[in-house]
């Protein structure tokens, strides 16, 4: 019976892909005056605040947007990517609201900001709104790219504070104060273009505490748990209108030893998917998925099998234990993988999207959407990391993304109709 049901669902997905194929093109130009509603949660689902209607999405990552937009002569590339994304039906974008020290720093030193770079972020928020795309904005990086925890630790060291390790970021009062100040600065920012504070702008779907948090000094997850609890509450004290998520990859901890042993890809990073996401001020859970990195050397079939288990186990736990929505916040296929071909990326993305749709349908919308890593425009070679997708140069990938967008939109309409007739 389970096999038959799966075949029926897959058949429906394929049928929708055919029906909504090349002829389904979303808008390519901004829609002046269009207003977005705030997204909130209702149990394990996203809903739109104004209508209480279900919200599912297909989305993308574009970490580079503020960095590029800080140069006004390059802003057209941001607009172009938003236009291409909108044309493919993508409605959520995850990007950085940080650049700590270094090139084009937003935060030059603790509490000191470059207004030109901040205006770049203003532009990103404004352009997203024009194209009907919501944003997930991340506050800091776990890694040294664009500063991250390492830069915070260095700032404190330079100020004469005794810092032992980057993991002090989660516990040292000075580092926590630096970070809280940055949160306050971003959340309360008054946009110079929209003339609206970020905390009042429904273009922003959610705040992300940190990109891929890890704490090597405490594998139990308790250190990170205390930090998340404190920082999520702090964000909510400034802004009760927006959702908050952690930015986790999804690694299991001691709460579920069987998941830790059989689902984790052999990693311990000091996080616990269950306890970290059970914190009351965390509104939804995220996972990232990179089997081409985590299971390097394994076959494509083995990597795809892991991907299916990774998604299905987290969906089950989000629905049954967390009772919160789940987002696949990063996934992709790198051109740097041995033997890479565009066809491999097409097959992989098609399979992942198929499973996301299937799990979203099976879970009643708990698996609410995904964000492919990552979209870029032409002439951005300096930002390439192997995962970049330039839609204008890869029409086959653009078609796969577009069909997934329409599949998720159709499923959202199906849930809306059923709710209204329940």
Feature roles, as predicted:
Residues 5-26:
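Cleavable N-terminal signal peptides of Sec/SRP-targeted secreted and luminal proteins
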Residues 1-3:
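Short, low-complexity, Lys/Arg-enriched N-terminal segments of secretory-pathway carbohydrate enzymes
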Residues 27-31, 419-422:
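Low-complexity, Pro/Thr/Ser/Gly/Ala-rich linker/spacer regions in secreted
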Residues 28-325, 331-356, 360-404, 408:
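Active-site mouth of glycoside hydrolases
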Residues 405-422:
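C-terminal helix/juxtamembrane-tail motif
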